[in-house]
């Protein structure tokens, strides 16, 4: 067992598949959060899984769960290899705080690693953590994106992670976005990765029952909810046209394979869109797009897009929103 420092307080950490995983912070730790996590080790056969992010203290006020570790690369120098799975994001404290982001899946020559699931928010306030992106592959399928986490009564559902790209195989499917509860948006469904055949986009989360916009690619809901969504779209249209971001809603995901940046979340609240992954069949320097910024009142920044080419490294992650983000 090793030791990791969390906001000035040391906690024990464990080891999982060669990856360090943070233990839960002290139950009465105030604003302490557990952020200790380590990526999985690389291998010629199968990369190690990333460690899970630590949970915040049970009664911590506004502390976020730790981010999951990135899965290790598999088969970087050989014909075979499976990318390691990304670690799950840690959960927030019991009542307040946002869930941690899931770790990205590792690159695998034959199969990309699965993205980690986003952590859940506190019961009253906080946004769900974003799901990690699936890992890239060359000859086989890209990894599936992780599901977004569950928010509190006030907060946005986490975006689903984008599916991993593949050079000659099928792109990975995107992860599902988390549903809003009362006030807040549903998370965007993760975009499908590019490949010989593109992966499917994940289902978007539904907006909160009182107010909130559905995430991208959300399923059909009740007639009352559909009318609510139509009214919000009318309100959002002039803001989107004049400023490039909605009043209430998430930013759009960047187009997969272009390295385009994700759009910014709403002026009031919303998640930033995920950045699109870089182009495939290109050098490893084909970078992914930056994630969009979160909403002004509350909202999480979008995940950065993974690189194209043959590496599956991670792009820049968007800035989180202020306030409850």
Where are the model-predicted features located?
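Collagen triple-helix signature
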Residues: 1-218, 226, 248-325
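Extended, small-residue-rich solenoid/repeat segments and analogous flexible loops
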Residues: 221-253
């Amino acid at each position: 067992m090793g030791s990791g420092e969390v906001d000035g307080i040391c906690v024990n950490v464990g080891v999982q598949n060669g990856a360090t995983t943070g233990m839960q912070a002290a139950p009465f730790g105030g604003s302490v959060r557990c952020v200790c996590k380590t990526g999985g080790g690389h291998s010629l056969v199968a990369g190690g899984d990333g460690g899970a992010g630590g949970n915040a203290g049970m009664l911590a006020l506004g502390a976020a769960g730790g981010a999951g570790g990135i899965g290790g690369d598999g088969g970087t120098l050989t014909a075979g290899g499976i990318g390691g799975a990304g670690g799950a994001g840690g959960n927030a404290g019991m009542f307040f705080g946002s869930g941690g982001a899931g770790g990205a899946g590792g690159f695998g020559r034959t199969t990309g690693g699965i993205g980690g699931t986003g952590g859940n928010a506190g019961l009253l306030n906080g946004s769900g953590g974003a799901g990690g992106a699936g890992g890239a592959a060359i000859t086989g399928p890209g990894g599936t994106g992780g599901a977004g986490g569950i928010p509190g009564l006030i907060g946005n559902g986490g975006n689903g992670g984008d599916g991993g790209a593949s050079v000659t195989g099928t792109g990975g499917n995107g992860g599902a976005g988390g549903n809003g509860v009362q006030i807040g948006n549903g998370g965007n469904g993760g975009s499908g990765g590019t490949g010989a055949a593109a992966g499917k986009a994940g289902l978007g989360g539904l907006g909160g029952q009182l107010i909130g916009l559905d995430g991208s690619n959300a399923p059909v809901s009740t007639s009352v909810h559909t009318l609510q969504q139509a009214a919000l779209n009318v309100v959002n249209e002039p803001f989107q046209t004049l400023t490039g971001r909605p009043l209430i809603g998430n930013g759009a995901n960047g187009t997969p394979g272009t390295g385009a940046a994700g759009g910014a979340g709403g002026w009031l609240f919303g998640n930033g869109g995920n950045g699109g992954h870089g182009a495939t069949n290109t050098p490893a320097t084909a970078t992914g797009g930056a994630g969009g910024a979160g909403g002004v009142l509350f909202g999480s920044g979008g995940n950065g897009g993974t690189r194209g080419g043959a590496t599956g490294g991670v792009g820049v992650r968007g800035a989180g929103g202020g306030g409850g983000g």
